[in-house]
Amino acid sequence: MQKFTLLKGLVAPMDRENVDTDAIIPKQFLKSIRKTGFGQNLFDEWRYLDAGFPGQDPKSRKPNPDFVLNQPRYQGASILLARKNFGCGSSREHAPWALDQYGFRAIIAPSYADIFFNNSFKNGLLPIVLSEIQVSQLFDEAAAFPGYALTIDLERQVIIKPDGKELPFEVQAFRKYCLLNGFDDIGLTLRQADKIKAFEAQRLAQKPWLARTLLA
């Protein structure tokens, strides 16, 4: 998992409440047995005017010119600004995968669905919670200033605005540690590889019949 330390990125404002996971990555694109390739179908039904199918070349699609991510001023955005209850709906880890693979590293919103919130941290995506007033101010500024960018300093837990003003945010210490070091669940487990191997060696030495049972 990619480390998250300091991010300076263009902001894309998605002015919708209750954006659910089926809007983030529609169900027809979940059939892949791989963890990659979901970014091209992020917000698919809003992003394109025609219906798509898995494996389709996005260059053959008809983009919706009114959708925020298709507007030239927001191309290359790495910070998504959203409204309350972002990521609601059915549980699917593909949602943070799609956001990450599109290029987003962080989301700023007043609130999130719990499962989406947890899945985001586990996949290297930082979901920041600010008050509705603060989020509305950011929406106003993003609309008023083309090229509006923010800096997110995870170590200090602050968002730095273009004028230098800082917005503090909260993040649980363990989640912060994992993001700063790029540790997902597998990475955390592998840090204990030597201890796991030592335990297994000791267990098999004490109970050798278990090995015979497993090999039978």
Swiss-Prot record:
EC number(s) per entry: 4.2.1.33
GO cellular component, as recorded: 3-isopropylmalate dehydratase complex
Pathway: Amino-acid biosynthesis; L-leucine biosynthesis; L-leucine from 3-methyl-2-oxobutanoate: step 2/4
Disulfide cysteine pairs (residue numbers): none
SUPFAM superfamilies (UniProt xref): LeuD/IlvD-like
One GO BP annotation of this record: L-leucine biosynthetic process
Reaction it catalyzes: (2R,3S)-3-isopropylmalate = (2S)-2-isopropylmalate
Entries under InterPro entries matching the protein: 3-IsopropMal_deHydase_ssu (IPR004431), Aconitase/3IPM_dehydase_swvl (IPR015928), AconitaseA/IPMdHydase_ssu_swvl (IPR000573), IPMI_Swivel (IPR033940), LeuD (IPR050075)
Keyword terms: Amino-acid biosynthesis, Branched-chain amino acid biosynthesis, Leucine biosynthesis, Lyase
GO molecular function, one term: 3-isopropylmalate dehydratase activity
Pfam family, one: Aconitase_C
Keyword Hydrolase: no
Quaternary structure, from the entry: Heterodimer of LeuC and LeuD.
The protein's role, per its UniProt record: Catalyzes the isomerization between 2-isopropylmalate and 3-isopropylmalate, via the formation of 2-isopropylmaleate.
Protein name, entry field: 3-isopropylmalate dehydratase small subunit
Organism, scientific name: Albidiferax ferrireducens (strain ATCC BAA-621 / DSM 15236 / T118)
Gene: leuD
